[in-house]
């Protein structure tokens, strides 16, 4: 990898056989590359193996032409909620209690990332938007040049599927 790449440690664990596994995000020109990481496996403090998903040839196809604030506006318009979690003081207070961080907030600060979409790499703003009404949470990726929504990854799913089950006391139920 060339000098534009760097690694950022984000977690580690010890396996049942005493091997340690260290996970690193891949940074390109200081920005995290979404969905790409490297895992370093060690045994007795020696590197045993390395695996992961990354591209050696990142060619960014856009420039930064809009501000983070403009991108946030595009992301919020895309979600189109009536009410967001950060607008509710009780939700903000609960978050601070759960995390133990008095500065934590649901407000989507956003960050610049590199996102691969259909073999192209884009600089994008990534926002974690948590809507209260209607309930929805998603990572929204906004093209840093055009302001278009490149990708939406929902974090809350629901399903309503009919099924049949054989119950212990009530026989077959649908």
Feature-to-residue mapping (PLM):
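Zymogen propeptides/activation segments of proteases
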Residues: 1-174
């Amino acid at each position: 990898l060339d000098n534009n790449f760097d690694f950022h440690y984000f977690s580690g664990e010890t396996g049942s056989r005493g091997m340690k596994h260290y996970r690193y995000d891949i940074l390109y020109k200081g920005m995290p590359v979404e969905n790409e990481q490297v895992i370093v496996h060690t045994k007795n403090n020696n590197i045993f193996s390395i695996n992961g998903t990354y591209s050696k040839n990142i060619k960014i196809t856009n420039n930064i032409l809009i501000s983070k604030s403009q991108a946030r506006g595009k992301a919020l318009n895309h979600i189109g909620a009536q009410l967001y979690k950060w607008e509710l003081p009780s939700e903000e207070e609960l978050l601070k209690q759960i995390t133990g961080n008095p500065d934590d907030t649901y407000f989507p600060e956003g960050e610049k990332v590199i996102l691969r979409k259909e073999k192209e790499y884009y600089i994008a703003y990534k926002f974690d938007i948590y809507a209260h009404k209607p309930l929805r949470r998603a990572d929204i990726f906004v093209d840093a040049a055009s302001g278009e929504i490149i990708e939406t990854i929902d974090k809350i799913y629901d399903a309503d599927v009919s099924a049949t089950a054989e119950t212990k006391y009530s026989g077959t139920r649908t």
